[in-house]
Amino acid sequence: MKCHYEALGVRRDASEEELKKAYRKLALKWHPDKNLDNAAEAAEQFKLIQAAYDVLSDPQERAWYDNHREALLKGGFDGEYQDDSLDLLRYFTVTCYSGYGDDEKGFYTVYRNVFEMIAKEELESVLEEEVDDFPTFGDSQSDYDTVVHPFYAYWQSFCTQKNFAWKEEYDTRQASNRWEKRAMEKENKKIRDKARKEKNELVRQLVAFIRKRDKRVQAHRKLVEEQNAEKARKAEEMRRQQKLKQAKLVEQYREQSWMTMANLEKELQEMEARYEKEFGDGSDENEMEEHELKDEEDGKDSDEAEDAELYDDLYCPACDKSFKTEKAMKNHEKSKKHREMVALLKQQLEEEEENFSRPQIDENPLDDNSEEEMEDAPKQKLSKKQKKKKQKPAQNYDDNFNVNGPGEGVKVDPEDTNLNQDSAKELEDSPQENVSVTEIIKPCDDPKSEAKSVPKPKGKKTKDMKKPVRVPAEPQTMSVLISCTTCHSEFPSRNKLFDHLKATGHARAPSSSSLNSATSSQSKKEKRKNR
């Protein structure tokens, strides 16, 4: 089969106008009517010209023909494809050449012809405008920089320009629809890409095989190694000479007299001696240093004192708690628990102050104390539990009064009854007075109640709020004198009084008025409880 471009005598990139002019010219030349002497040959040529123009004048037919031109020329799709390209596999052996000379079977001649044939095949598959200059292999005397190096640089990254259309399995012209045509084109493209990749790898492997055995490359590599070794030797020689030069400079170096440090300490001592002789022995400086040390110590002490003051400012003595910040201290001072503890502490301190200030107790101490405590007691809201605690000592007082009165026949004066009534009233207001009243009125037959001054609170929440206020030890040293109403004898304690009453029989029954007042007060308290 003849190429259509050759039949029309045009280039492969010819335009439509050029194709039309060439067709008309050849048609007039080979038309059978104008070649009567050679009608058969003219008819055959005219058919080829007409077929070529029919294909190339159609853009789609021309594009398909350009892609499959080599396959059609070498057998096409109708018959078996005859690949007449160079077989590169037989050049991967040393038996294909003999020696490294420039003769016909020498190394350089054989492989030079191989790469010239590969370049020719590439030129046939591309347009003239796209032709690149293929570097030649050269001979045994070729220069490395101008011939050998450019050759290997190009062919080691070789990419073929062939489209390998003869490898396609499907003829897209036979597709019934466009979807089937696209599927055929996709499969054909995969096959062409695979064949192109195999061709590129085959050529690159052949180049690597040749380069490994090329004497010119080996000679250049040896030359480069020698040059590198020479450069390293020169660099080492320069370093050695530099070291020798520095060693000579060190030997020639002489230290100046003003740079020596040997006599520096001696000179400093002499200077100090001169200054001491002229200005003194330096005691003032020592004193200054001592003063500075003292100032530093005083500063440390003052800092510690400030820290202690800061700690004292954030400490609550009533609740026995310390705080880290002023805000926490202020919040604590606003709490109900703190106010209650402050009131109890204030009351305790006032009582201690009164006990220390008065060496003797008046005839009616309960009346005076109760009046003063009623005036000085802080007015604050108390919880229900605290009110109940206050009412219990009053009931104990009434019970003791009833038991001791008729059972033992103790005589009670009207003054005592008045005292009991006043103390019962005071019990509702001050928890501290419960202690004093029960200590004076309770009989000694109940030693357990005598030991307990204030009932012990229970529970975690009321543990701090209801701490018992202990009676200070000093008032116990000042004994309260108790007198017998019959013989007016004074006793230091209630036990002594009751021993006297049992021994002498001076006990008298309480009057009816006092009993009535005691029972009435008890009934009122029971009513309050029932509420």
Curated annotation (Swiss-Prot):
Residues 442-453 have a biased composition (Basic and acidic residues). The keyword Metal-binding applies. A zinc finger (C2H2-type) spans 314-338, 482-506. Expressed in brain, placenta, kidney and pancreas. The keyword Manganese does not apply. Pfam families: DnaJ, zf-C2H2_jaz, ZUO1-like_ZHD. CDD domains: DnaJ. InterPro entries: Chaperone_stress_response, DnaJ_domain, DnaJ_domain_CS, J_dom_sf, Matrin/U1-like-C_Znf_C2H2, Znf_C2H2_jaz, Znf_C2H2_sf, Znf_C2H2_type. Residues 279-311, 327-474, 502-531 are annotated as: Disordered. One of its GO terms (molecular function) is zinc ion binding. GO terms for cellular component: cytoplasm; cytosol; nucleolus; ribosome. Residues 381-392, 455-464 have a biased composition (Basic residues). Residues 3-69 form the J domain. It is found in: Cytoplasm; Nucleus; Nucleus, Nucleolus. Keywords: Chaperone, Cytoplasm, Metal-binding, Nucleus, Phosphoprotein, Repeat, Zinc, Zinc-finger. One of its GO terms (biological process) is protein folding. Residues 511-522 have a biased composition (Low complexity). Residues 393-403 have a biased composition (Polar residues). The modification Phosphoserine is found at residues 283, 302, 370, 511. It is linked to Bone marrow failure syndrome 3: A form of bone marrow failure syndrome, a heterogeneous group of life-threatening disorders characterized by hematopoietic defects in association with a range of variable extra-hematopoietic manifestations. BMFS3 is characterized by pancytopenia with onset in early childhood. Some patients have additional variable non-specific features, including poor growth, microcephaly, and skin anomalies. BMFS3 inheritance is autosomal recessive. Interacts with HSPA8, PA2G4 and ZNF622. This is DnaJ homolog subfamily C member 21. It comes from Homo sapiens. The lineage of its organism: Eukaryota, Metazoa, Chordata, Craniata, Vertebrata.
